From Swiss-Prot:
Residues given in the record as IMP binding sites: 13-16, 38-41, 128, 142, 223, 238, 302
Gene3D superfamilies cross-referenced by the UniProt entry: Adenylosuccinate Synthetase, subunit A, domain 1 (3.40.440.10), Adenylosuccinate Synthetase, subunit A, domain 2 (1.10.300.10), Adenylosuccinate Synthetase, subunit A, domain 3 (3.90.170.10)
Biological role stated in the UniProt entry: Plays an important role in the de novo pathway of purine nucleotide biosynthesis. Catalyzes the first committed step in the biosynthesis of AMP from IMP.
HAMAP family, alphabetized: Adenylosucc_synth (MF_00011)
Active site residues per record: 13 (proton acceptor), 41 (proton donor)
Gene designation: purA
Binding residues for Mg(2+): 13, 40
Name the UniProt record assigns to this protein: Adenylosuccinate synthetase
Cofactor, free-text remark: Binds 1 Mg(2+) ion per subunit.
Length: 437
């Protein structure tokens, strides 16, 4: 038995969906532990492209239990659309389960999210506009609506009474928007409750039962370390905790239940939205990475900002998450480059530093110090073993492993499942990897 957490080691969009899908074949339970529909992952199966925002990647394996945990925020409209899409593609969803205690994103959350971002003007954060922040804010203020409330009209009416009155006053008097009709919401969300009721469970109880029965449990994070509310580039962050510690809170397990933490990182770096990004590229190479990597957000469709691999934030992610190993994705995107740069440290106010500054203002002033490595100018897309890789590609991976001081267990060379080199099975293999320092 092994219980594994999969986290993003950068700013999200690292390819966690593919890695989780790969590991899910060995998992009995897959748990999404935080975030909402602001996250998106793309999975390619039999040339079909499936884009999911809420439902865990493990849903593609019919024997796997897929839990949407208590730490998530759920938009039932999106969940039902994803259920329909999966059914239309003949995918068995009988293993899909939703925590009764997860909070629900309501229509007013989305309206307020967009209005707040509009009001910020030039100081905007770059939110997806999906209502995630306002949903988590209501949760913290104990004004939230939970999944269990959608199953009982009396509970839903009581739960809506105070927050909806407050939100309507805010919408009308501060943002100049129309008030939201209470009866319409109640009717609509009771129907959502009726439709999702077969999937609603006590999430924590199921996880602990699986643990007692020595099952393999995979905890799937959304977004990435540098978007963590407490440990990211605040305020340009998400409203939850994507780091490995968030798995304990969002799934309701103790840290001793976690056996291993896998960090997923691209062979370069991307970021969506606002906020500092020291290794960001402009011009031809940026366009090349964006086009070859298909760097457009699954959730927003926004073009991602691209840059060289940043080893400083990488080492920070190793420390914050307690990473045991890495999965490096999109190595093939670098195939046509003459040379490749890796940030090994920063210069801040004339001083060389090798750590991630806690101030976003200081981080924005950091100038990257690069190590230049030769490119390989040949395709890696069909490589299936380490020895198939061009020597410069192997050298690049070894350099990343040495810089991050953590072994590489998986290398992804494309979107398809078979475009993967598994150096070590992170669930069943020994706690080591062959490609290491």
């Amino acid at each position: 038995m092994a219980n594994v957490v999969v986290i993003g080691a950068q700013w999200g969009d690292e390819g966690k969906g593919k890695i989780t899908d790969l590991l899910s074949r060995s998992a009995d339970v897959v748990v999404r532990y935080q975030g909402g529909v602001n996250a998106g992952h793309t999975i390619v199966v039999d040339e079909k492209v499936l884009k999911l925002h809420l439902i865990p990647s493990g849903i593609l394996y019919p024997e796997t239990i897929c839990l949407i945990g208590s730490g998530t925020v759920v938009d039932p409209k999106v969940m039902l659309k994803e259920i329909k899409m999966l059914k239309d593609n003949d995918i068995d969803i009988s293993g899909l389960q939703l925590a009764s205690t997860a909070h629900v994103t309501m229509p007013y959350h989305c309206v307020i999210d967009a209005a707040m971002e509009e009001r910020r003007g030039l100081k905007k954060i770059g939110t997806t506009g999906r209502g995630i922040g306002p949903t988590y804010a209501d949760k913290s203020q104990r004004n939230g609506i939970r999944v269990i409330d959608l199953l009982d009209e009396r509970k839903l009416r009581e739960a809506l009474e105070i927050p909806l009155a407050e939100k309507n006053e805010l919408l009308e008097k501060i943002y100049g928007k129309e008030a939201i009709d209470k009866e319409k919401i109640i009717e609509e969300y009771l129907e959502f409750g009726r439709l999702i009721k077969p999937h609603v469970v006590d999430c924590t109880r199921i996880i602990h039962k699986a643990s007692r029965n020595k099952k393999n449990i995979l905890f799937e994070g959304a977004q990435g370390t540098l978007l963590d509310l407490d440990h990211g580039t605040y305020p340009f962050v998400t409203s939850s905790n994507p780091v490995s510690g968030g798995a304990c809170i969002g799934a309701g397990v103790g840290p001793t239940l976690i056996d291993r933490v896998i960090g997923v990182a691209k062979a370069y770096t991307t970021r969506v939205g606002e906020g500092p990004f020291p290794t960001e590229l402009k011009g031809k190479i940026n366009d090349q990475l964006c086009d070859r990597g298909g760097e457009y957000g699954t959730t927003t469709g926004r073009r991602r900002r691209c840059g060289w691999f940043d080893g400083v934030i990488g080492k920070y992610a190793v420390e914050v998450n307690g990473l045991d190993c890495l999965a490096i994705t999109k190595l093939d995107v670098l195939d046509e480059l003459e040379e490749i740069k890796v940030c090994t440290s920063y210069e801040l106010n004339g001083e060389k530093i090798d750590y991630f500054p806690s101030s976003a203002e200081d981080f924005g002033k950091c100038t990257p110090i690069f190590k230049t490595l030769p490119g390989w100018k040949s395709s890696t897309a069909n490589c299936r073993h380490l020895e198939d890789l061009p020597p410069p590609a192997m050298a690049y991976l070894r350099f990343l492993a040495e810089l991050m001081e953590v072994p590489i267990a998986i290398v992804s060379l494309g979107a398809s499942r078979d475009q993967t080199i598994v150096v070590e099975d992170p669930i069943h293999g020994p706690k080591r990897a062959l490609l290491s320092s």
